């Protein structure tokens, strides 16, 4: 309420015509610190008092004391300071209203406030009573007022009030704890002179659920809160009445105690009386518990109870009591004849549950197809005779009826007449006749019309005949058989219903069958069967052998050999013999017994609930069978303890070591059966069945679940939401009551764990509805209890009501109302207040516009031919026994809709028309607008939208908008979706393989199609799986294949993938619109290499590589091995008895059927470990300045060795984890003389160690280039030989690129003008009295601008449209090359290639650029090559001429040396050469000559003439160039050149180098005598550890370390190719070294003598002599070359190298 209305309301309290003086305001007003308050006030004065200048309104605080001015309408300055800005006069003196507003209240504001008004000096009035204001720090709690008695179904008001009111901010009262669906609140505020207050009223419809509810009223003011509460006591009739049945959760058996308890969930006041009813009849019991001491058939029925209190009563839902028992009734009751109908009925007491399942047994054998309570034997036959009983079963157990006998009378069947002969002498015959009949028949046995025996006593009295009889059985024994005893014997059977006869042809001369060595043999033993007969042996005699009555073999032999008898050979054998004239009778059967060890046992476990009758409880059955002969000893073990054996025992349970009396053991041959009554927890788990006899043993295992753990839910499995549920895990175990932990599972997922056997759900919520199970954790292997379903009941939630509009089918709407409730709710749909349909049935005719369909908690109403009158509010109400709720929506019928022709369901490419329809007639000029997925379609403005061939991208939601001319409103249609179907596309087939223990293969096929496609997965031509039938194929499904199907997805899992599963799989996808397919190769990795003892072994160890194959046909496979990609041998495994480093390589095996490509395994690498060897220690010195020395130690070791480097006994460095394996590097920066000396390196690994040492000498002489090492061409350069240790006189010798340049006393070389010829490597030697010292080479670089640019081109003869353009230049530093055409850059050497379209591959080298050009035009093209570096640039132009010619070689381009060769330049296309034509030839781009003839002839081609040739034809019409061709001249190897190098100090290392010249390349071999030492072919010779071979084209080098005596001798180097061969030989050994030493000693002696003579010649002659001696000494110390007829030996000093002439060999190292 606004402030002004409140003032007007306040002014209304002043009556008109008031004639007295006075002020009215509340007695007291309350406020809270920080808030505000209003003091309502009105005043009055006589009507005759004149008001000349208005009325002055004044409010005072503490009027009788301090009299502080609070508000002054005339002079605000008089207001007390503490009230300024916090008070506001809200009244209007003219209307005699004097309200005062106090803001930002403080506790100090408490006190009396008085109002005074002044009209004139005479007329003024003060209120002496005033208003008491109270301001507190905290608000007082609100006051709640409620009715005295609350009764269910009544409506009451609860009032909450507070004295606090503030106009500036809201003072809020709020009710809490009420049910919003059944309550409403409203508030009011009081501003009157009589008082101020705020009231909040709660109006509620009382329900029994409100009993005990706490209502709270909360006050919010000035950031403070306070609340009051009230507890409701609602009287109501009893609620939640139901009957609890005990026992529950299982079947109630006859004789058991049954208790029915009437439970009342809530009642206020308490229940006063209980009534019981059975089948609607009232019982005498008036207590809350009904006891049935011994349940009987008559106790079954429907029970209810009624609870009553002072308010009302309630009847419980009915509960059915069923006594779980059965009995069988047979009809007819008398004798039963064949072809009569017999009916057996399995009767149960009343109120039998509907979920009963019936089973029928005949002679204790289950009848598979009989599962109803009635068993009918139509046209009964003799086979129906037997004992019958029925079994009723539900989820809690089963119960069997007593057996009844059914006997079907019938006449005798055909008798069975058999004959036997005595097996040894054949003098006794036995005939046996048996028959089946009911009642028993009389049997008569006769021969030739003469009765020999009968069951009635008539028989032949001859002593040779003796007969015995039994029920339906007759036996006749004939002694001293005679020929007359042969013939036809007849057996007749007769009873009251008929008779039957059979005959037998008996032969007294029947054959006999003998078994050798015995009738009982062991499997695998040889057995001979012999057939003896009385027939004379003749050549045409034939013997027939029969096994179990079937012909087995026929032949001339009287013996049948079984070379290795098996269990399948066991059985009954007989034989026949015949010749050309007669035949013997069949022999008597002889039984062959084959003994064999136990096969795999069959072990099954089962649990029967109440299988043996009422109260029997649970019965566990463990059954173990085995196939063996002799019968096996069976033994059942549980947790390594023998439970039962098949051994005979003296009685009791001694065989199981003191078993429980609950356990019953049944034994039979090859069978062991154990029954456990009420199994305990300790008896659950894994059982092992072992079978053994004298020939072997076998075993198998199975898990037994005795349901020792049972989950019970109390009070019931079905509860109301908000009640309490107790879940108890009952465990039957030996240690009952001992502490245990329990695991709880909800819907199969672990839910909780703890020591409590009972879990309480309080309150029960609907989300608690689930399958619950439990398990005890104390016992290992304990089984889960049987899951129990908890159902939760709750009233309906608020329904969900939706409306769907279908504009394509006659303007139809579909209303769908769904709700969540349990039990199911009754749904009702209203239009306004008109009921349209309910879930019980439609309220309108279903054949009209309305069509209703109801499902569980769902109601659908279809409204056809919508009209504008169908718009409005629709309401759906849901009701069940627990409550009700409703919801509503407003439905608007649109003025327009979209019609689709032919249908919204379309195929891709189909024509479709969309029409925009409206309810009323369409006026002319109506405009239309179409939208797809909410976006306007600009191209269509007519009433129809057409698609000649719709595509997938055009699918979507379409709607239209129609607007009549001159109308401001539009008709908007609801969207309608177009669904476009299409054929399968984008088929993908993915294969994965997991090589873990399960070897799981996965094939996943996906496709994009609509409608979803049918997927078929084929392996070759075999169907493996499909989306229709899962795993399938002609041979049936395999248990290894698991199929998962989803829309457009087919997943195949192959468990235990094998070799046969590999190959190409095809996935075919098809729907009604088309098909597509994809294929993939599946690799099951079924072939693997197994290495024993492992993939990492030590050198010299035994290694075995086995090819493992997962396959079903291992015997039909062949094996192939590959070592480093090379095929090795065919075997299942490869033994390596003494593995070496050469074996450390990659291995793989291939497996496949003969004649087919093998399936290869994945390669596995064999890692061979060996001790450290080939330890090398080297050093390098920096070439410039010698400021860095590098010491490098390397070793060959596996595993990598630990390297340590030391100098003078001091460790300098060692390898770490971050070091390069088998390498140790030491850098000495600024080395000093003290760093010289011997360095040692040691290599150590777990397999061994090695050591080596090296002397380090620092370099003292170096070459200095001034001003720098790189100078421009033409600049001066000085090369200085710096030797700090030189002493005059010093002789300096200079070398350029390894060649001697000059020598003299000058230490420098000066070049005034540097040219490119000066570039290269410079080194020097300094020689003085101390000796000779050499420097390392220093490189001089002369820089110059690019020059000699050459642009050449040719066309590729292999591809007519491709040409090659090459640009080369000479420059230093290298130039940057660019190739352009028509001003566009095609390629550069800096890496920017293919800048223009049409360019091809680019090759870049130093100062060279090569470009392949594709699609070359027919005409000539001009190309520009530009070269540029820092010193300048150059460019050249070349033309890519049209290839109009081709070089033709006769006989070819590969020609033997000395043969004749003609190269012809042939023109392409057009006429041949004419007059004035010239042909120029080029060899390696060098012009040879020009001739008028197109042929270049070679009479005897030589190897020097090999190279590149092309021709240029200059014709009158223009020039034509050919592409170059390569000419190869072939020649046999010349005599090889063989060089031998021996280390001069000790001769411990040597090198043999053999080279040859040949074309094609030759194959080189090196022999020592007859031993092949090395070859240029791969794996040509087994290399020894100390011999290293290096092969290159036409060259073979052999390094021999630690030279042995066996390595010395005459070596022969042979070279051969297809044209011939050549060889040479030389001696290699220390013999040449000894000769060299002797020669050196001789040189020293001669040199000394010559030196003494030359001293006499003077200083000049001495100088000349000294030079010659130095050179000779250098040669003697460092290099001596001895040339013999067949050997060349060169020794080198590793610390120095010299060259006398340009022809000396370069130093090695």
From Swiss-Prot:
Asked if the Swiss-Prot or TrEMBL record annotates the protein with the keyword Secreted, the reply is yes
> What does UniProt give as the signal peptide span?
1-19
Which factors induce or repress this protein, as stated in its UniProt record?
Answer: By interferon-alpha. By viral infection.
- Output the superkingdom of the source species: Eukaryota
Domain Ig-like C2-type residues, every copy: 139-233, 238-320, 326-405, 411-507, 511-593, 601-705, 708-785, 799-894, 898-977, 984-1083, 1085-1165, 1176-1248, 1259-1341, 1350-1442, 1445-1528, 1536-1631
Q: Recite the UniProt keywords alphabetically.
A: Cell adhesion, Cell membrane, Disulfide bond, Endocytosis, Glycoprotein, Immunoglobulin domain, Lectin, Membrane, Repeat, Secreted, Signal, Transmembrane, Transmembrane helix
Name the residues that bind N-acetylneuraminate.
Answer: 63, 116, 122-126
Any keyword Repeat? yes
The residues exposed to the Extracellular compartment are 20-1641
Ranges facing Cytoplasmic side: 1663-1709
Q: Which residues are glycosylated?
A: 159, 265, 339, 499, 697, 726, 730, 741, 886, 1104, 1138, 1251, 1462, 1476
Q: Give TM segment ranges.
A: 1642-1662
Question: Which Gene3D superfamilies does the annotation name?
Answer: Immunoglobulins (2.60.40.10)
Q: In which tissues is it expressed?
A: Expressed by macrophages in various tissues. High levels are found in spleen, lymph node, perivascular macrophages in brain and lower levels in bone marrow, liver Kupffer cells and lamina propria of colon and lung. Also expressed by inflammatory macrophages in rheumatoid arthritis.
Sorted alphabetically, the Gene Ontology BP terms of this entry are: cell-cell adhesion; cell-matrix adhesion; clathrin-dependent endocytosis of virus by host cell; inflammatory response; negative regulation of type I interferon production
One annotated GO molecular function is: virion binding
SS bonds (residue pairs): 36-166, 41-98, 160-217, 262-305, 346-390, 433-491, 531-575, 624-689, 729-774, 817-876, 916-960, 1005-1067, 1107-1149, 1193-1241, 1281-1324, 1367-1425, 1465-1511, 1554-1613
Instruction: Describe the subunit structure.
Output: Interacts with TYROBP. Interacts with CLEC10A.
Q: What does this protein do?
A: Macrophage-restricted adhesion molecule that mediates sialic-acid dependent binding to lymphocytes, including granulocytes, monocytes, natural killer cells, B-cells and CD8 T-cells. Plays a crucial role in limiting bacterial dissemination by engaging sialylated bacteria to promote effective phagocytosis and antigen presentation for the adaptive immune response. Mediates the uptake of various enveloped viruses via sialic acid recognition and subsequently induces the formation of intracellular compartments filled with virions (VCCs). (Microbial infection) Facilitates viral cytoplasmic entry into activated dendritic cells via recognition of sialylated gangliosides pesent on viral membrane.
Family recorded in the similarity comment: Belongs to the immunoglobulin superfamily. SIGLEC (sialic acid binding Ig-like lectin) family.
Name of the protein: Sialoadhesin
Q: Which source organism does the UniProt entry give?
A: Homo sapiens (Human)
């Amino acid at each position: 309420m606004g402030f002004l209305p409140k003032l007007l309301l306040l002014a209304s309290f002043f009556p008109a015509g008031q004639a007295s003086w006075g002020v009215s305001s509340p007695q007291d007003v309350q406020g809270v610190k920080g808030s505000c308050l209003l003091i309502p006030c009105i005043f009055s004065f006589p009507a005759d008092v004149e008001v000349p200048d208005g009325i002055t309104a004044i409010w005072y605080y503490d009027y009788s004391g301090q009299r502080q001015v609070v508000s002054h309408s005339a002079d605000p300055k008089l207001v007390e300071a503490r009230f300024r800005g916090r008070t506001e006069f809200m009244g209007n003196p003219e209307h005699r209203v004097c309200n005062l507003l106090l803001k930002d209240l403080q506790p100090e504001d408490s006190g009396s406030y008085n109002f005074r008004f002044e009209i004139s000096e005479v007329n003024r009035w003060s209120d002496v009573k005033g208003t008491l204001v109270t301001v507190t720090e905290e608000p007082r709690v609100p006051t709640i007022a409620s009715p005295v008695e609350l009764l269910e179904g009544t409506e009451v008001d609860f009032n909450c009030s507070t004295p606090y009111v503030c106009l500036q901010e809201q003072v809020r009262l709020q009710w809490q704890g009420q049910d919003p669906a059944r309550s409403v609140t409203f508030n009011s505020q009081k501003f009157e002179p009589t008082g101020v207050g705020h009231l909040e009223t709660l109006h509620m419809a009382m329900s029994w659920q409100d009993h005990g509810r706490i209502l709270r009223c909360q006050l919010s003011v000035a950031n403070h809160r306070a609340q009051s509460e009230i507890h409701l006591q609602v009287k109501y009739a009893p609620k939640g009445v139901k009957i609890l049945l005990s026992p529950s959760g299982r079947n109630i058996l006859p004789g058991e105690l049954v208790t029915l308890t009437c439970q009342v969930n809530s009642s206020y006041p308490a229940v006063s009386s209980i009534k019981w009813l059975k089948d609607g009849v009232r019982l005498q019991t008036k207590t809350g518990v009904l006891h049935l001491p011994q349940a009987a058939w008559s106790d079954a029925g429907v029970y209810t109870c009624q609870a009553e209190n002072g308010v009302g009563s309630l009847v419980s839902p009915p509960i059915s009591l069923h006594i779980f028992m059965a009995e069988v009734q047979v009809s007819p009751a008398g004798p039963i004849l064949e072809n009569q109908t017999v009916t057996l009925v399995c009767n149960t007491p009343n109120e039998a549950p509907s979920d009963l399942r019936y089973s029928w047994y005949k002679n204790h054998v289950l009848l598979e197809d009989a599962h109803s309570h009635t068993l009918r034997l139509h046209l009964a036959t003799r086979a129906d005779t037997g004992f019958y009983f029925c079994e009723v079963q539900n989820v809690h157990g089963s119960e069997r009826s007593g057996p009844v006998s059914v006997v079907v009378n019938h006449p005798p069947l055909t008798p069975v007449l058999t004959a036997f002969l005595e097996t040894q002498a054949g003098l006794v015959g036995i005939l046996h006749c048996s028959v089946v009949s009911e009642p028993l028949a009389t049997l008569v046995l006769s021969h030739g019309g003469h009765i020999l025996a009968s069951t009635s006593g008539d028989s032949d009295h001859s002593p040779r005949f003796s007969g015995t009889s039994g029920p339906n059985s007759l036996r006749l024994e004939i002694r001293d058989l005679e020929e007359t005893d042969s013939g036809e014997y007849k057996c007749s059977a007769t009873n009251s219903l008929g008779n039957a006869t059979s005959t037998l042809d008996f032969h007294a001369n029947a054959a006999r069958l003998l078994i050798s060595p015995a009738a009982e043999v062991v499997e695998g033993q040889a057995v001979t069967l012999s057939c003896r007969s009385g027939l004379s042996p003749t050549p045409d005699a034939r013997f027939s052998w029969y096994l179990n009555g079937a012909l087995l073999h026929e032949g001339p032999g009287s013996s049948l050999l079984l070379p290795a008898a098996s269990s399948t050979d066991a059985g009954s054998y007989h034989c026949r013999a015949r010749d050309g004239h007669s035949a013997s009778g069949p022999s008597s059967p002889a039984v062959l017994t084959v003994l064999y060890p136990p096969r795999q046992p069959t072990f099954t476990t089962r649990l029967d609930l109440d299988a043996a009758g009422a109260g029997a409880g649970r019965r566990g059955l463990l059954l173990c069978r085995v196939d063996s002969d002799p019968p096996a000893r069976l033994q059942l073990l549980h947790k390594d303890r023998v439970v039962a054996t098949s051994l005979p025992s003296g009685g009791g349970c001694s065989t199981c070591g003191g078993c429980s009396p609950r356990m019953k053991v049944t034994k039979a041959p090859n069978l062991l059966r154990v029954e456990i009554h009420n199994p305990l927890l300790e008896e659950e788990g894994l059982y092992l069945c072992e079978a053994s006899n004298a020939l072997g043993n076998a075993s198998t295992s199975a898990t037994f679940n005795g349901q020792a753990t049972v989950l019970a839910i109390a009070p019931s499995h079905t509860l109301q939401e908000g009640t309490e549920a107790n879940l108890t895990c009952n465990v039957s175990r030996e240690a009952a009551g001992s502490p245990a932990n329990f695991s709880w599972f909800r819907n199969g997922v672990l839910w909780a764990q703890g020591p409590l056997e009972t879990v309480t759900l309080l309150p029960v919520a609907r989300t608690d509805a689930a399958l619950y199970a439990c398990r005890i954790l104390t016992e290992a292997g304990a089984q889960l209890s049987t899951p129990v379903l908890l159902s939760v009941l709750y009233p309906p939630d608020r329904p969900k009501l939706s409306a769907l509009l279908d504009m394509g089918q006659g303007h139809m709407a579909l209303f769908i109302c769904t709700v969540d409730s349990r039990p199911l709710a009754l749904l009702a749909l209203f239009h306004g207040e008109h009921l349209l349909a309910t879930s019980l049935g439609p309220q309108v005719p279903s054949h009209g516009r309305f069509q209703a369909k109801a499902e569980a908690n769902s109601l659908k109403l279809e409204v056809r031919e919508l009209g504008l009158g169908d718009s409005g509010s629709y309401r759906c109400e849901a009701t069940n026994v627990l409550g009700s709720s409703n919801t509503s929506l407003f439905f608007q019928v649109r003025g327009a809709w979209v019609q689709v022709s032919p249908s919204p369901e379309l195929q891709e490419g189909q024509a479709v028309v969309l029409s925009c329809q409206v309810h009323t007639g369409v006026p002319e000029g109506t405009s239309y607008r179409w939208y797809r997925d909410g976006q306007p379609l600009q191209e269509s403005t007519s009433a129809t939208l057409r698609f000649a061939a719709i595509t997938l991208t055009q699918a979507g939601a379409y709607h239209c908008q129609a607007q009549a001319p001159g109308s401001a409103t539009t008709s908007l249609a609801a969207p309608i979706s177009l669904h476009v179907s299409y054929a399968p596309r984008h088929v993908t087939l993915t294969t994965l393989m997991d090589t873990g223990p399960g070897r799981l293969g996965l094939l996943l096929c996906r496709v994009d199609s609509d409608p979803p496609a049918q997927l078929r997965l084929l392996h070759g031509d075999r169907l493996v799986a499909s989306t229709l039938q899962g795993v399938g194929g002609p041979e049936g499904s395999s248990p290894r294949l698991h199929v998962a199907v989803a829309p457009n997805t087919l997943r195949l899992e192959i468990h235990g993938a094998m070799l046969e599963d590999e190959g190409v799989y095809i996935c075919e996808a098809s729907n009604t619109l088309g098909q597509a397919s994809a294929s993939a190769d599946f690799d099951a990795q079924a072939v693997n290499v197994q290495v024993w003892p492992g993939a990492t072994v030590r050198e010299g160890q035994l290694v075995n590589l086995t090819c493992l194959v997962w396959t079903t046909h291992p015997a039909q496979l062949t094996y192939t091995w590959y070592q480093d990609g090379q095929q090795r041998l065919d075997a299942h495994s490869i033994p390596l008895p003494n593995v070496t480093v050469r074996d450390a390589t990659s291995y793989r095996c291939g497996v496949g059927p003969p004649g087919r490509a093998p399936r290869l395994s994945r390669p596995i690498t064999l890692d061979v470990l060996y001790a450290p060897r080939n330890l090398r220690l080297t050093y390098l010195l920096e070439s410039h300045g010698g400021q860095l020395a590098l010491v490098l130690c390397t070793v060959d070791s596996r595993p990598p060795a630990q390297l340590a480097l030391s100098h003078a006994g001091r460790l300098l460095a060692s390898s770490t984890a971050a070091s390069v394996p088998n390498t140790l590097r030491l850098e000495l920066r600024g080395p000093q003389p003290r760093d010289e000396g011997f360095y040692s390196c040691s290599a150590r690994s777990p397999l061994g160690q090695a050591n080596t040492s090296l002397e380090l000498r620092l370099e003292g002489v170096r070459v200095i280039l001034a001003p720098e090492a790189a100078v421009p061409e033409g600049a001066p350069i000085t090369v200085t030989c710096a030797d700090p240790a030189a002493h005059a006189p010093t002789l300096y010798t200079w070398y350029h690129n390894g060649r001697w340049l000059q020598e003299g006393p000058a230490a420098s070389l000066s070049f005034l003008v540097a040219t490119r010829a000066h570039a290269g490597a410079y080194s020097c030697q300094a020689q003085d009295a101390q000796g000779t010292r050499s420097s390392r080479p220093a490189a001089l670089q002369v820089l110059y601008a690019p020059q000699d640019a050459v642009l050449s081109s040719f066309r590729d003869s292999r591809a007519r449209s491709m040409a090659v353009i090459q640009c080369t230049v000479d420059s230093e530093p290298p130039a940057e090359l660019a190739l352009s055409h028509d001003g566009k850059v095609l390629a550069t050497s800096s890496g920017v290639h293919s800048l223009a379209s049409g360019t091809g591959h680019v090759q870049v080298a130093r100062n060279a650029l090569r470009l392949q050009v594709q699609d070359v035009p027919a005409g000539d093209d001009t190309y520009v090559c530009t070269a540029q570096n820092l010193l300048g640039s150059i460019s050249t132009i070349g033309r890519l001429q049209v290839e109009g010619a081709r070089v033709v070689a006769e006989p070819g381009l590969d020609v033997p040396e000395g043969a004749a060769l003609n190269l012809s330049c042939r023109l392409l296309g057009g006429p041949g050469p004419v007059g004035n034509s010239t042909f120029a030839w080029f060899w390696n781009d060098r012009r040879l000559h020009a001739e008028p003839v197109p042929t270049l002839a070679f009479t005897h081609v030589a190897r020097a003439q090999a190279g590149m040739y092309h021709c240029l034809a200059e014709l009158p019409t223009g020039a034509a160039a050919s592409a170059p061709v390569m000419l190869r001249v072939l020649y046999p190897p010349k005599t090889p050149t063989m060089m031998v190098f021996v280390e001069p100090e000790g001769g411990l290392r040597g090198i043999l180098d053999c080279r040859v010249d040949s074309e094609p390349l030759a194959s080189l071999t090196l022999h020592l005598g007859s031993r092949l030492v090395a070859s240029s072919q791969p794996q040509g010779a087994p290399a020894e550890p100390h011999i290293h071979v290096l092969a290159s084209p036409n060259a073979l080098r052999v390094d021999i370390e630690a030279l042995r005596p066996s390595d010395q001798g005459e070596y022969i180097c042979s070279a051969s190719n297809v044209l011939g061969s050549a060889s040479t030989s030389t001696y290699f050994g220390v013999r040449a070294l000894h000769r060299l030493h002797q020669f050196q000693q001789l040189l020293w002696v001669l040199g000394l003598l010559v030196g003494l003579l030359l001293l006499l010649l003077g200083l000049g002659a001495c100088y000349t002599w000294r030079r010659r001696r130095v050179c000779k000494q250098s040669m003697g110390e460092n290099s001596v070359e001895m040339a013999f007829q067949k050997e060349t030996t060169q020794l080198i000093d590793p610390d120095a190298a010299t060259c006398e002439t340009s022809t000396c060999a370069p130093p090695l190292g």
